[in-house]
């Protein structure tokens, strides 16, 4: 098979390999089409004549319109296709009531915390409340690596530039995100590290935390001690002793929470990696578990694939408000809502934001949407959730971690080395990338494009890997020491 028609109503196919000009293209269900020009892998080719102004249809939905008449076999990309997106939309609810057939959950070897929550890692986290103490946090963690061993799997810190010179909602958002991170069950112990004169004060963090376990969450204000390294190390020693009392035990997979993310997408993302992840998400929900879909701007143009799956009108209105609120966020900054696909996305075959979005939401599978979470919000309902966060890789994976995700399934067609605080599994969309960057990869979904595995077979393989990672197998990012955060800022800097 040279190319694929994703939906029978599509007027394009996607090249599964580079197509040469004049080549007869084999695409099941389409019939014979001869390429009029070279078509790179992952890019689109028209299967029939399309008049100027008419829609390009992919995934069964319009992903833009052609700007000139095109003939069958024409390469379709940014030179002859434009977006249909503009501003806010008056969404309507037409519920489809998707049904998920229950599946008996397997178990994984995880940690059961004293409060009943479940973890896939047993680590100590040092969280700076302000960027001024990032280097203090780094030195503390470097000096505490000898504590790692037994059931204590790591000591990590998460530098960021914020926590001071912020005001209002922007400041509150930073504080809420840091506190949400501290609640993650993978952190057996947390040290909030403060300077002492910043906006994000010790007292504000305490107020945001509410009820908490003082043996698990500790505080150190650097200006209040003579030697912050000595004081900090003593706290980490105490936290480590407590963490080592926890060991792995069988946990039902129904208690897993998995984040869904893509970055560096290409034209194969919506054909290989994202549908594979979507099937894993559906399987997790069928087992009674939870998955979380984010990247709100990368839902624009594909909203109908999501909104009609909301379980009731309250969830629908929350999702619609989130989508239009994000568009208003763009407009308030005098930006268009559709200027999203990156140069790498376009090189890989993604032409418009609708094109990117329709592929992006494949990660959400077909399960009902049960809840909509604000930024820095935490999961409270089992099933498929939507989370308000931007498409930026590091900001959104940080938000997924803060929401309580035990791991993140991250699809990529271009490759990326980073890792979130939660284990981040890189799912590659194509085998060429897998051959070129094996050190960044956890799973190659490119085998779907080559015909080596079906979508369902690849999803079964990925699910087995998910259980292994939940049981302690380290991801490629973890093996390289990548544990990073990025905070969504929307305000002035004093």
Regions found by a protein language model. Give the residues of each.
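Metallocofactor- and cofactor-centric catalytic cores in central/energy metabolism, strongly enriched
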Residues: 1-407, 414-417, 422-494
């Amino acid at each position: 098979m040279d190319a694929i028609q994703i939906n029978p109503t599509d007027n394009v196919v996607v090249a599964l390999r580079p197509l040469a000009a004049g080549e007869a293209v084999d695409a099941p269900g389409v019939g014979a089409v001869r390429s009029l020009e070279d078509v790179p892998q992952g890019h689109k080719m028209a299967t029939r004549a399309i008049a100027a102004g008419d829609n390009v249809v992919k995934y069964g939905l319009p992903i833009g319109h052609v700007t000139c008449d095109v003939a069958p076999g024409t390469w379709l990309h940014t030179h002859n296709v434009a977006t249909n997106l503009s501003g806010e939309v008056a969404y309507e609810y037409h519920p489809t009531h998707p049904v998920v057939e229950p599946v008996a959950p397997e178990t994984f070897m995880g940690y059961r915390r004293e409060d009943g929550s479940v973890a896939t890692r047993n680590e100590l986290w040092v969280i700076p409340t302000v960027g001024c103490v990032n280097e203090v946090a780094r030195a503390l963690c470097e000096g505490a690596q000898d504590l790692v061993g037994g059931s204590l799997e790591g000591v990590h810190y998460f530098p960021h530039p914020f926590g001071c010179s912020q005001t209002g909602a922007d400041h509150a958002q930073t504080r809420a995100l840091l506190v949400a991170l501290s609640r993650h069950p993978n952190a057996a112990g947390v040290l909030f590290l403060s300077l002492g004169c910043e906006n994000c004060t010790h007292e504000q963090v305490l107020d945001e935390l509410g009820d908490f376990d003082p043996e698990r969450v500790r505080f150190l204000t650097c200006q209040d001690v003579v030697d912050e390294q000595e004081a900090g190390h003593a706290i980490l020693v105490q936290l480590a002793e407590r963490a080592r009392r926890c060991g792995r035990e069988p946990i039902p997979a129904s208690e897993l929470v998995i984040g869904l993310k893509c970055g560096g997408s290409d034209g194969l993302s919506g054909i290989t990696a994202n549908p594979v992840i979507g099937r894993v998400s559906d399987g997790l929900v069928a087992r009674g578990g939870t998955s979380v879909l984010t990247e709100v701007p990368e839902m624009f143009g594909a909203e109908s694939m999501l909104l009609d799956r909301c379980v009731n009108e309250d969830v629908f209105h929350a999702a619609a408000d989130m989508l239009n609120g994000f568009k208003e966020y763009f407009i308030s900054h005098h930006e268009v809502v559709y200027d999203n696909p990156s140069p790498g996305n376009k090189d890989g075959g993604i032409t418009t934001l609708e094109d990117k979005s329709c592929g992006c939401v494949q990660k959400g599978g077909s399960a009902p949407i049960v809840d909509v979470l604000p930024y820095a919000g935490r999961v409270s309902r089992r099933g498929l959730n939507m989370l308000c966060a931007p498409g930026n890789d590091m900001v959104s994976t940080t938000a997924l971690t803060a929401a309580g995700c035990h791991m993140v399934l991250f699809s990529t067609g271009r490759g990326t080395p980073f890792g979130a605080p939660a284990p981040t599994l890189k799912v590659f969309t194509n085998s060429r990338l897998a051959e070129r960057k094996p050190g960044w990869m956890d799973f190659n979904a490119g085998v779907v494009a080559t015909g080596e595995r079906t979508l369902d077979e690849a999803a079964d393989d990925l699910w087995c890997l998910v259980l292994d990672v939940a049981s302690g197998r380290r991801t490629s990012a973890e093996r390289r020491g990548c544990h990073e955060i990025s905070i969504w800022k929307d305000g002035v800097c004093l």
